[in-house]
Regions:
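Conserved catalytic core of sirtuin-type NAD+-dependent deacylases
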Residues: 2-170
Length: 170
């Protein structure tokens, strides 16, 4: 959950200082919805760059320990809702990102992949050469999770002898 990355400076959602308790023109749940993204991409990208992109964020002890457990053969997979990529930065190889990642982007029209820097550090609404909007590869509210990622997550959970749940208010 988001709580795993707060030590790295990534905001969570529900704590006192979390995104849901900050003041915006729209509630974060609205800003992070598919319909809002389609209707107000400029507003979405302002929020994205101001709140979701945290430059200089580094993996913390939790990320590093999970990667170490994986290297030792004691951890089969990391299943995360986080979109920050810090598990991979810590060295975890088998990371199932249920909500996607801000480090992957693609054109909504032609599907062409784009480097995240174009979205995360650009200005305005990023567009592809084909004219389509480039979006981060994250799951917005009103969108379904990736069936393949969910199936893999269910497989690892079913096969697990021990399940570590951290950083979430479940």
């Amino acid at each position: 959950g988001a709580g795993v990355s707060t030590e790295s400076g990534i905001p969570d959602f529900r704590s006192v200082d979390g995104l849901y308790n900050q003041k915006y023109d729209y509630p974060p749940e609205t800003i992070l919805s598919h319909s809002f993204f389609m209707a107000h991409p400029e507003e979405y990208y302002k929020f994205h760059r101001d709140k979701l992109v945290v430059d200089g964020a580094k993996p913390n002890r939790a990320h590093l320990r999970l990667a170490e457990l994986e290297r030792e053969g004691k951890l089969q997979a990391v299943i995360t809702q986080n979109i920050d990529g810090l598990h991979q930065a810590a060295g975890s190889k088998n990371v199932l990102e249920l909500h996607g990642s801000i480090h992957r982007c693609y054109c909504m029209r032609c599907g062409r992949p784009y480097p995240a820097e174009r979205v995360n550090h650009g200005t305005g609404v990023p567009h592809c050469d084909c004219g389509g909007i480039i979006r981060p590869d994250i799951v917005f509210y009103e969108e379904c999770l990736d069936d393949d990622v969910v199936s893999k997550a269910v497989h690892y959970i079913r096969e697990a002898e021990v399940l570590i749940v951290g950083g979430t208010s479940l």
